[in-house]
């Protein structure tokens, strides 16, 4: 009897977790009105704000020059690019300084002299040097649309936002079985889930294509130099003091990135993020949120990586217990509820992959759908391993920054992109894809 009660309780908890996650993931597609509201409004041509674009780069000499060139093609007239390099990284420094020599009015190079380096320390090093009304953050491998700053400027002006979070999208879904799922995760997160968080007043910001009014950022003290998820931490702190955050996603305007080039790199990246979420949870800034539902959402979101690890281990164990041990028929049937939710999630992911390919002009073949389904259980094992590793590192007091290397896979010819020059923005997007082909 007790065993049956335990099995039913665990199964119902797993089922509720799966349903909540799926419902939030589908937020943007609930109604046509919600979907339309997630995009940028078309700018009117006025330039209201100036931008300081921070570009931290460490051992990124292979991709940094391309990113700077793309930023310099921006249609906005009032911005500066601040590249932050390490004092012990001469190769990346040389690339940054060459770019500054070519355009000294736009590009400046700041040197981070911290002995132990990480991204938030680099960003804080540059913050006192920012001259713009708004600080924007990009990563060294980012492929940024020339019209993005104009759209962000318009969003700040028309909404009165303190923060604007733009979209980020991994593109090289064809590179490996795990890159396919990684790309789809980003698609659901930035296309849908973050909009729900902004609507509810609690948002863990993304690591780049995030824009914050300079005075707001300085009032907040910049980034936490000891946090492995400095972006999430900043979003939690700003949400806790009631700052207005606007999220906008447009497939033409997204910043394009690549997935980690190896499975080990992905594991380390997820470990860092999970450990950072755990750090943010333990800091308890989220407890200052005014609403009870906001605090519940914050608690659940920050604990999600570890709930994933729990579910990845417990679901097969729970089914095995129900089938092999003496459990009532009713309890055995309940154990399959999480599996039903998983099947529904798979169907939604298949539809999402089709939409992803359609929006970005990428050819999604039948084999990609097979990889999506077959790779699901293995990807969950990877996420569970990263969560367990994050807990182990946090308990051991290890918080060194494990750098994710980039090779520019999103800049290579995928032979899967077609042009869609239906309007000015689509034409620019087609040119951006042609540049990636070259």
Segments (PLM) and residue ranges:
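Acidic donor-binding segment of Leloir-type glycosyltransferases
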Residues: 69-111
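N-terminal signal-anchor transmembrane helix
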Residues: 22-78
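Cell-envelope/extracellular polymer assembly enzymes that use nucleotide-activated donors
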Residues: 49-52, 80, 218, 233
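Membrane-embedded multi-pass helical conduit in multi-pass membrane proteins
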Residues: 34-43, 301-396
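Long helical/loop segments within the catalytic core of UDP-sugar-dependent glycosyltransferases
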Residues: 100-104, 109-133, 146-228, 267, ...
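N-terminal membrane-anchoring/stem segments of glycan-assembly enzymes
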Residues: 1-45, 346-355, 383, 389-394, ...
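Catalytic donor-sugar/metal-binding loop of nucleotide-sugar-dependent glycosyltransferases
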Residues: 235-255
